[in-house]
Design a protein with these regions (language model features):
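Long, contiguous amphipathic alpha-helices that act as assembly "spine/axial" helices in icosahedral shell
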Residues: 45, 70-132, 149, 159-173, ...
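Extended, compositionally biased alpha-helical segments that mediate assembly or anchoring
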Residues: 233-236, 240, 254-308
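Acidic, Ser/Thr
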Residues: 327-336
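Extended, solvent-exposed, turn-rich assembly/linker loops in the middle of proteins
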Residues: 129-200
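N-terminal "assembly arms/tails" that initiate or stabilize quaternary assembly
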Residues: 1-76, 298-303
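Extracellular fibronectin type III
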Residues: 389-403
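Surface-exposed, short loops/turns at beta-strand junctions within beta-sandwich domains
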Residues: 363-378
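Extracellular recognition modules
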Residues: 379-385
Length: 404
């Protein structure tokens, strides 16, 4: 009898070897010890709480509480793709080699970039919700000031969590290039080892904090996902949605951002077994998600470009009566965010990225249909903010210019 090869096991070994070292966001993976994941879309994360010191009474210390709670998180993304290879396009002797090479390319060019994009955007959104936000026009960052700006942001994080925590700096490649041209940078740069499972990587560091150059195309605060099926989305992957500002850099202590990804080749069907036709069928899927821990938010800072949200649009049309111009807002919301709006008789209200938009200051939630009525000539601002703390991540301003 011929030997039976478990191709799924062969390809999953390739995944284990490659998947966790390729991402630029590998430092986020499994950063919290004790996470429980038993398959499915939910994970349980331990949260430890304890009281501080109190005064001794004689030889007796005051009683304190030590609590261990489990917070349930949902893996936001369940993605996959099936591939087919004709029986006669490859013979069985080199099938594993051919698919193994294709899998490497697929991981490097399709899977890992998507995961990096989504993790970076989620970290930026988490910083708006729980961490620190610095608004800085990218156009104003130069070789003369970038080192000072970056060191100042590192200090802001260390001022909250101390200098003993290792920091990770996710920076766009363009800005990293500017940083390397700084006249004083050689005083601060070094190289450090970083352990990813069984692999040891050599990463650059600034002031002993990891510095990870990342393609600028990944450094956006909002992305859309193609479903791989609908017309115009069959190519799959992510699409850039300019609903939020671009990211200059993210600075994080590892406990502040956590990510889990579980890729797998779930099944390989041979041509002899395949009921659909004479071809090999390979089924790939990945559960993944990441989140910012609210109680660790002090260890996270995002430096955002101050550009407004170009893909957030506001249109106006005449209403049925005076003071009833119809305003329609369109855009796609990130998970955990909502629209608010405010109109005044003067200029459009100011919005600060990372600033709080209070309901007591007349900021109102946008209706589900995206339509509101207000007065022609009024200035109007529409913002996207985090439900958790009402901090703005994006906005658009304009004037109601139609109606009676």
């Amino acid at each position: 009898m011929a030997n039976s090869i478990n191709y799924a096991a062969v390809f999953n070994r390739i995944l284990d070897e490659k998947f966790y070292v390729l991402p630029r966001t590998m430092w986020m993976e499994d950063s919290t010890p004790g996470i429980i994941w038993e398959g499915g879309r939910e994970v349980k994360i331990p949260k430890l709480g304890m009281d501080g010191l109190g005064n001794m009474s004689g030889y007796k210390a005051p009683q304190g509480d030590l609590t261990l709670e489990w917070e349930t998180k949902t893996l936001q993304w369940y993605r996959g793709r099936n591939f087919s290879i004709g029986r006669y396009d490859v013979d069985e002797t080199n099938f594993a080699l051919t698919v193994g090479n294709a899998l490497n390319v697929f991981l490097r060019e399709k899977v890992v970039p998507e995961i990096d994009c989504l993790r970076i955007a989620a970290a930026a959104q988490g910083a708006v919700a729980y961490g620190q936000v610095i608004a800085q026009a990218s156009a104003d960052i130069t070789t003369a000031n970038i080192l000072g700006l970056l060191l100042a942001d590192i200090a802001k994080v260390q001022d909250k969590i101390g200098e003993q925590e290792q920091l990770y700096i996710q920076i766009s490649t363009g800005l990293k290039n500017l940083l390397e041209q700084s006249t004083q940078i050689t005083r601060y740069l070094n190289v450090k080892d970083f352990q990813v499972r069984s692999a040891t990587l050599r990463l650059e560091a600034i002031n002993d904090q990891y510095l990870i150059g990342t393609p600028s195309g990944y450094m956006h605060s909002v992305f859309g996902l193609n479903d791989g099926v609908t017309g115009g989305q069959t190519v799959g992957g992510v699409t850039f949605a300019n609903l939020g500002p671009n990211i200059n850099w993210i600075i994080a202590a590892r406990p502040a951002v956590d990510a889990i990804a579980r890729p797998q080749i779930s099944k390989v069907i041979t041509p002899d077994e395949n009921q659909e036709g004479e071809f090999w069928k390979i089924m790939f899927s990945v559960y993944h998600g990441n989140w910012v821990m609210e109680n660790k938010g002090d260890g996270l800072l995002v430096n955002l470009d101050t550009a407004s949200a170009d893909d957030l649009t506001v249109s106006t049309e005449a209403g049925a009566s005076a003071g009833a111009s119809t305003v329609t807002v369109t855009g796609v919301l990130p998970e955990g965010y909502m629209y608010v709006w405010k109109a005044t008789s003067g200029s459009a209200p100011n919005v600060t990225i990372g600033g709080t938009l209070a309901a007591t200051d007349s900021w109102a939630e946008l209706p589900a249909d995206g339509k509101i009525t207000t007065t022609n000539g009024y200035g109007i601002s529409v913002a996207i903010f985090a439900k958790s703390n009402r901090k703005a991540i994006a906005y658009v301003k304009g004037t109601v210019s139609a109606g009676t």
